[in-house]
Every structure is written in C-alpha cells, then in structure tokens.
C-alpha cells in the first residue's frame, strides 16, 4: 500500500492487514482519522514472506526498541539506501512513492473521489494536484459527441 504516508506505514500493526478483504486499516492517520486502503496481492505476498522471515509480533515493522514500531527516520534511511543500490539518481523521497501511486491511479482512470479516499485527503482540492502531474494522452480522450449515433443539430 504505497499510498500510505510514511508515519502511517511505520505504525501499522499486524491486525491492520486484512487479507480476506484485501484491505489495510490506517488508524489515526493525518488529522486523527481512520480509513481503509487497498492491499495489492503482490504486496500481500511480500508481506507474508517478510512475516515468515522476521515473525513480528505486534507492529508490522518492529523498531529497535522493544515493543515499539520502526521509526520514520529508519524507513527514510532504508529508502535512500535502496535508491542508491538501484542506481537511481533522480531526486525522490519516500513521499514520492505516494505521489506516484496517486498519479498512476488517475492515469488508470480511477475517480478523483476514490483517490481522495485512498489518500485520506479531507478536501478534493488537495487531490486535484495529481491531475496536473498526470500525463494523460489527450489524443486518447474520446469526445462525447463521437459516442452517439444521433446526428448533431
């Protein structure tokens, strides 16, 4: 669920992963709101492998301190290390993954309302920023006038 904010990812509990409904529960997201997000089958498989390897108990991503989750800083350090190993030089942060996820949803035709819900935005205006980032091919847009058999005029 790469649409999560870094603090939301850090504070995920094992019980927040609902593999039957393919959902992730985000508790106390920005503004203190709870919400649900989608869980990809590919991510679920990776989470299962991760669980079998590390056997976390309460927090999905356990921290160095006992009974605590991973820190935001640790996630950021892992991201930058992975970016370096991959040879990616373009500026990017953990938050870039969230922006990319939203942009891909919009490019795939997901409604702005659904993207807003997934990202946990209070206002649809906040979500519209992804419309400007999206590089939709205008040549692929079909005019509503071409969708009818009735003559015009």
Language-model segments: which ranges?
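Conserved tyrosine-mediated DNA breakage-rejoining catalytic core shared by Y-recombinases
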Residues: 4-49, 125
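Catalytic-site neighborhood detector that most strongly recognizes the C-terminal catalytic loop/helix
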Residues: 28, 125-144
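A short, basic/aromatic helix-end/turn motif that makes direct DNA contacts
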Residues: 12-16, 116-122, 131-132, 146
């Amino acid at each position: 669920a790469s649409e999560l904010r870094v603090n939301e990812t850090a504070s995920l509990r094992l019980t927040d992963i609902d593999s039957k409904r393919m959902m992730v529960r985000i508790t106390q997201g920005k503004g203190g709101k709870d919400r649900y997000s989608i869980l990809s089958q590919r991510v679920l498989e990776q989470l299962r492998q991760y669980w079998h390897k590390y056997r976390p108990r309460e927090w999905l991503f356990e921290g160095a301190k006992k009974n605590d989750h991973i820190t935001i800083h640790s996630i950021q350090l892992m991201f930058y290390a992975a970016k370096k190993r991959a040879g990616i030089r373009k500026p990017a942060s953990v938050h870039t993954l969230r922006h990319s996820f939203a942009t891909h949803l919009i490019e795939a035709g997901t409604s702005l309302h659904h993207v807003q819900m997934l990202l946990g935005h209070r206002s649809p205006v906040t979500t519209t920023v992804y419309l400007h980032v999206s590089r939709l091919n205008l040549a692929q847009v079909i005019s509503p006038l071409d969708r009818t058999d009735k003559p015009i005029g």
